[in-house]
């Protein structure tokens, strides 16, 4: 076959894979029987960047690993969402289970993979705030005849965190080779209705999809027409609380506040749906002040003083993640095309 024809076929194959991944991502967003993630990729990468800029807060052994392998840490912190249809795995093998996260870290046979494991566990610690407080509250506070779902609020948070961090998430996932880490995930994570290879393809399609210009336009229009607010001050509060849980877990592991919570938030998410139905049946949904009282009663935002967040010195975050300071990139240049 002539060289030009081969190149044309290759471009066609790549385009086909991109479109296929895109369609799988869209389908899963629209039809999926479960939440796609907790915090979105931009939020997880922003949290990872905040930690990488304040490694003086974590134990020396953890710091030494993350200083050498920041890219691998960031990949682990995003790729914990690589498995879809999680509800179909055997009991105790859910990818957002603390034991699975610990198994990934224990199975790491190199410092690079250890950094991935720390990233994975940091992701789970971060999700304890997203799934037990943020999403349940928002599901209740937006009790309307057409509920704004789990995925909407996660992407809404990502939009507030900023495009710079979403771009960095795409850079981490798409522009670097992660075969070693993916082999570890394939070894430890249980098969869902999809093979790991298919899960990985959907995951990468999701990362591409969220940066797609058409998706950005559509979601921006949704935001413009939304009557539900998410103030930057509240975004900053959730971000700092999540950072506390992440650092606390890396310091104290099983004795940390995060370890006492379910990263998937199954109980609280289920409770939020029940309380929402109750609010709608009692017409409480027409009274925002009543919904606010119910949210505070069932899913209060933690008010304990922050320990680790006030110790940040990085100007990128000290004013809050929504401060508008451009994201710093701690990862190297791309290693794959």
Where are these regions (language model features)?
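Alpha-helical transmembrane segments of multi-pass membrane proteins, especially transporters
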Residues: 119-120
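N-terminal leader/auxiliary helical segments
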Residues: 2-116, 127-337
């Amino acid at each position: 076959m002539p060289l030009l024809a081969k190149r044309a076929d290759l471009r066609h194959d790549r385009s086909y894979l991109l479109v296929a991944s895109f369609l799988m991502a869209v389908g899963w967003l629209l039809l999926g029987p479960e939440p796609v993630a907790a915090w979105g990729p931009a939020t997880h990468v922003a949290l990872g960047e905040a930690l990488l800029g304040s490694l003086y807060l974590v134990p020396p052994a953890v710091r030494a690993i993350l200083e050498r392998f920041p890219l691998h840490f960031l990949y682990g912190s995003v790729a914990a969402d690589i498995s879809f249809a999680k509800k179909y795995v055997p009991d105790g093998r859910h990818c957002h289970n603390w034991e699975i996260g610990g198994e990934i870290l224990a199975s790491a046979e190199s410092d690079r993979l250890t950094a991935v494991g720390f990233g994975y566990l940091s992701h789970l610690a971060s999700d304890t705030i997203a799934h037990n407080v943020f999403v349940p509250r928002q599901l209740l506070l937006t009790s309307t005849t057409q509920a704004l779902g789990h995925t909407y609020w996660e992407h809404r948070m990502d939009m507030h965190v900023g495009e710079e961090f979403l771009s960095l998430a795409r850079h981490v996932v798409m522009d670097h080779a992660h075969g070693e880490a993916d082999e570890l995930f394939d070894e430890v994570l249980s098969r869902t209705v999809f093979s790991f290879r298919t899960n990985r393809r959907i995951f990468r399609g999701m990362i591409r999809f969220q940066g797609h210009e058409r998706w950005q336009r559509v979601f921006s229009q949704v935001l413009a027409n939304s009557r539900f607010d998410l103030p930057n001050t509240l975004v900053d509060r959730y971000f700092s609380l999540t950072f506390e849980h992440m650092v606390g877990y890396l310091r104290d592991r099983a004795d940390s506040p995060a370890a006492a919570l379910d990263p998937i938030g199954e109980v609280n998410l289920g409770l939020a749906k029940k309380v929402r139905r109750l609010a709608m049946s009692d017409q409480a949904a027409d009274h925002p002040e009543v919904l606010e009282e119910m949210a505070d009663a069932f899913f209060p935002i933690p008010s304990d003083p922050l320990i680790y967040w006030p110790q940040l010195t990085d100007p990128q975050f000290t004013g809050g993640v929504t401060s508008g300071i451009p994201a710093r990139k701690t990862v190297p240049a791309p290693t794959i095309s």
